[in-house]
């Protein structure tokens, strides 16, 4: 059999093989069979080398023509198979829009976010403006401008996270006070929500991160009675009931006098584990803004006065909803969180 006859037989065999191709894999296998390194046309290349010189051009042209024919047919077949497989894939992914849909699960506010918003909303109703400051703060804004002495324990690394010798993670939202008083002249009435950080052991009552709201008011003739009236009104609205407040003298560098605020426990003095059988629950620290803080902001303490108060949001949430462990707020336990969403 001559090479020409062999090429014709290859064409016929190729046509038979092509009729059995139904997928991309079948097509790939067929291509390897005829055009691969060990395929049928490899044998023709070997035969061509043994042909007489005067016949090589003619026979070589015939081999190339047959090979080109097979390549063109394979290309056409690949386009047909690709279109077919894409259509099949489309049908697999097709969505029946007539079927009833499935409701996506809805999220809800985290309890801390909910309580934080409730607290801020109450102060906004009282005429306060919302202001924020960065979590990463200079030691100056976090301590110095708020009348913290250089050797105050709060400045030490065992209590505060230092990023470098003069930069800290803020320990309170009072850094808003130092910024706002330096930027705005009285009257100033601001509520400042945010996240705070302290180097403490994590327990049922404390955490290294917590949320705080600070509120402060500076104007002429602001008095201690304005502070107590504000506190009384706030807690009455927040807890939805009349609560008795108790004020205890305390020390905070940025206020003078300073007080700690307690509210009456729901046990009404009978004593329970929540109030440690005292009948009272600590809820805030407050006081009249220290004259040194006003002077640092170039505000004359002889002309202006003001009060400041700060409260922990986790503490308020625990009291309002009867939660005994602060760690529950950050453990992402949906069984706990869904009770409040």
UniProtKB/Swiss-Prot annotation:
EC number: 6.1.1.20
Keyword presence, Lipid metabolism: no
Listed Pfam families: Phe_tRNA-synt_N, tRNA-synt_2d
Enzyme class: ligase
MF terms (GO), sorted A to Z: ATP binding; magnesium ion binding; phenylalanine-tRNA ligase activity; tRNA binding
Cysteine pairings via disulfide bonds: none
PROSITE patterns documented for this protein: AA_TRNA_LIGASE_II
Domain of life per record: Bacteria
Cofactor details (free text): Binds 2 magnesium ions per tetramer.
Gene3D superfamilies on file: Bira Bifunctional Protein, Domain 2 (3.30.930.10)
GO CC annotations on file: cytoplasm
UniProt keyword terms in alphabetical order: Aminoacyl-tRNA synthetase, ATP-binding, Cytoplasm, Ligase, Magnesium, Metal-binding, Nucleotide-binding, Protein biosynthesis
Compartment(s) where it occurs, according to its Swiss-Prot or TrEMBL record: Cytoplasm
Binding of Mg(2+), residues: 256
GO annotation terms (biological process): phenylalanyl-tRNA aminoacylation
Named cofactor requirement(s): Mg(2+)
Catalytic activity reported: tRNA(Phe) + L-phenylalanine + ATP = L-phenylalanyl-tRNA(Phe) + AMP + diphosphate + H(+)
Family that this chain belongs to: Belongs to the class-II aminoacyl-tRNA synthetase family. Phe-tRNA synthetase alpha subunit type 1 subfamily.
NCBIfam families, sorted: pheS
Assembly description: Tetramer of two alpha and two beta subunits.
Protein name (record): Phenylalanine--tRNA ligase alpha subunit
